[in-house]
Every structure is written in C-alpha cells, then in structure tokens.
Amino acid sequence: MVTMKDLLECGVHFGHQTRRWNPKTKKFIFGVRKNIHIIDLQKTLRYFRYTYNIVRDASAQGKSIMFVGTKKQANETLKEFAESIQVPYVNYRWLGGMLTNFSTIRKSVRKLEIIEEMENSGQIDLLTKKEKLMILRKKEKLDKYLGGVRHMKKIPDMIFVIDVAKEKIAVAEARKLHIPIVAPLDTNCDPDLVDYPIPGNDDAIRSIRLFCKEMSEAILEGRELMQEEIVHADENSEEIEYVSNEEKEEMLAEIQKEITQGAE
C-alpha cells in the first residue's frame, strides 16, 4: 500500500497555481509555495488508504471498475494498467452516452467485431479497393474510441477518473446513473463531484502512474479475496442432492391432491 515516501517522490503534494483553485478544496491544502497550493499529504495518505480499501472491497464483491483518463499525460499510463488487469477503459476521447446510452455504444462495438470477422474470413478482400479502404478506416476509428470498452457487457459499477475537471461528461453520466466515482482530487477540482476523492496532483506523470498503480493493485487484491472466498465456500459446502423430473412430478401430484381434498 502507498507510503508517505511514495507520495513525496511522485510529487502528489503539488497542486495548481493559487489563482486556479477551487475554494472547496481548502480543507485539503497545507499551504502555499511560490503561488502554488501544497496539498496536505497526511490527509492524502489517509484518503488514499481508505479509498484503496473501498476499491478492493468492491472488486472482492465482483463489481466492475472502469478507468477513465484521456489527457496526454494520462492516456498511455492508464491504458497500460487497465489492460494489465483487464478492466474497461477510455483513454482517448469520452463519447457522449458511453454510460447513459450504452446500448448504442454496444452497437458500435458490434460494427468493429463485424469488420474484424470480415478480415479473418477474407470477405473484405472481395470488396473494391475504395470500399476496403473505407471499412479499414472505420475500423481504425472504432478501435481508437472503443477498443478499451469492447469487452464491457454492461455499465460499470464504479469508475476511476484521472482529472475530473477535464472528464466532465464522464463524471456527469456516472453521477446521473449513481455510479460511484473514485478520483485524485487536485486543487482545481470540485470535491462534491467525487464519491471517493484522494487529494493529490492529477497532472504529473509520476503522480498519475502512482494512482493507477495503487488502484490496479486494489482491484487485484480484491479478486484474490473473492477467489479465496469461493474456494472456502466450496470446501465447506455440502453435496447437493438433485431432484429428478419424476420426483418433481410426483411431488406436484401429491400437492395438487392435497389442494383438491382441502377444497372438498
């Protein structure tokens, strides 16, 4: 789990310039240095550990967690960690309706799958050069926007967001659907929009990497706990005696007979 040394080395304590702050973050600010707000790392550490446990427990319950971070400093790091633990992610651009109009998103994902099937079967080679080029461009665009959510069959139970100020649409959709939001909370962000905030820098690459790493580890730890629980339950479960169709029919006949006799 994260330590104070980790936070200092990754520059998690550096907030934004004082003129860009959100007054609601005042309780998380330690002071000012050269017109930059310094975040109170004692509070960061406390919130970090609390949120780590929240994410771990959600994962242990089998809940799905989506990673969101589209800005330049975050997109590659976020993709790396999301793919390493096989969770859905959006790292290029948030398409409106990604959550609130999920059925349409699934249809777009299906288009991507159809194009891939055409490639694998060789069917795409039967098209004209122009048609093939257009379809391959379509595939490239769909994969760019939806590659991270192509295996997501339902909306996530929780989202982890890098920079809630930038990802306004994603945050608004999650809040509309009452999906809990986990996020680093920089000094320019609104704490009221985040269910599980972690006061800290959401711009520096090292800081972003630390947040992604810790949330990924929390998810993996939760999965391990869930697996242990399943194994433990299997060891203690009694052998189930299945009822045959004949026994079911016999039992239903007896019940029907009792009902008839009771009516008389």
Swiss-Prot record:
Metal-binding recorded as keyword: no
GO-annotated molecular function: structural constituent of ribosome
Gene3D superfamilies found in the cross-reference section: Glucose-6-phosphate isomerase like protein, domain 1 (3.40.50.10490), Helix hairpin bin (1.10.287.610)
Annotated GO biological process: translation
Signal peptide extent: none
Keywords: Ribonucleoprotein, Ribosomal protein
One GO CC annotation: cytosolic small ribosomal subunit
PANTHER family according to UniProt: 30S RIBOSOMAL PROTEIN S2 PROKARYOTIC AND ORGANELLAR, SMALL RIBOSOMAL SUBUNIT PROTEIN US2M
Protein family per UniProt: Belongs to the universal ribosomal protein uS2 family.
Name of the featured protein: Small ribosomal subunit protein uS2
Species per Swiss-Prot/TrEMBL record: Helicobacter pylori (strain Shi470)
